[in-house]
Amino acid sequence: IMAKGLAKKEDWRTFVEATDTQYYEETMLQGMIIGLAKMELEERIHYIRLFVPRINNWAVCDIFSGELKKTAVGKGKETVWQFIQPYLKSKEEYEIRFGIVMLFHYVDEDHIDSLLEYADLFTHEAYYARMAMAWMISICFIKFPDKTMKYLKQSKLDNWTYNKSLQKIIESLRVDKETKDIIRSMKRAG
């Protein structure tokens, strides 16, 4: 509610451009305002670019990425797809997590093959980056079970991320018991 109110004020840009935020809540509000405020896609991308380096935890990352579904991805899906590509190669834990969580908006017929190809190239060591990848694979499985199952059977993912992907699939309420039993049997040692 607070973010929506601030996003409607004329001076929201001053608050969003402030880089001296000390508190989690301030950073969260900035991200939400970037997602909610009325602006053209080009301006929103400008503010996204400024904001991503400020992300320092999974909650800010995930809520920020969720806020961008309608206002960024919904306004220029392929433009945003191109924009997030460098983040998918970042060495920074929360920059790459931002890129991966943004990929959740692309689990569709046009992008599923690219997402699974990217997953096989993924080698980041950071915990929150690996968790995001496991989460993305579980979403891919829910929406594209056959393609994702085929991917999992030949996946080059490291064992930890692979097994965490299986765990997330098993935890899903949208996967039936028989499929969960198959997924359990696919766990790798280590």
Task: Show which residues each predicted segment covers.
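Alpha-helical scaffold domains
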Residues: 1-190
